[in-house]
Amino acid sequence: MTFLPIDRLQQEILQCNRCPRLREHCTQVAAVKRRAYLDWEYWGRPVPAFGDPYGRVLIVGLAPGAHGSNRTGRMFTGDRSGDVLYSVLHKTGFASQPHSTSREDGLILRDLFITASARCAPPGNKPTPEEVRNCRSYFERELDLLPNVKVVVALGKLAFDNYLDVLKTRGVIGSRAALVFGHNKVFRTAAGQPALISSYHPSQQNTSTGKLTEAMLAAVFRRARKVAERGMHRDTETQRKNSKLGGS
């Protein structure tokens, strides 16, 4: 088996101990477990990215769920957020099946790669700004090792802000004043850079209250595919939004 640089980076991430609070939380959750998962051997470590390393669409999420990814060891796997996300990815042609239950379930992602702003499950699903910054170097290296990305889909405002912080640090963008988070909004950040699509996160809170429906999320990924295949100039709503931002 040939290991790509992105694979070697994931192995490095597995050994990370930069955030003592997160590591303690992950191992404690893995030891105590939830009653429904007492027969599981929890992953309890940093969760690696997952998907097609040559994909044109990159999903950036928030962080692993305590009894989801922290249990299964795969992004968005084993909780309600993943149930919604993979159902949508299957319907829109990015996933081989609509369910994601374990690392051994046979799921294959096509033309899409999934990563997160933080790699360890945080208490209350809220990593601190420092913990997100601790993970950022891994995220930046992933961006450099994914050669075909045309569209970045940020699930939630934290992921959106984290990606923009990377672009600002790298000098790709200046002011962020015109880049305002919202659902299914598309942005051209700079020439030669991937398009950015912001989306509500498929959290249980958002989906159970109807703030985000599967149809709304599917619209995001249909747009992501369209932009990846045809470019932003073929997306009329993107053109309209960019004209308001002063883009071409």
Predicted segments with their positions:
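Short, low-complexity, charge-dense intrinsically disordered segments
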Residues: 233-240, 244-248
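A polyanion-binding, active-site-adjacent surface
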Residues: 3-229
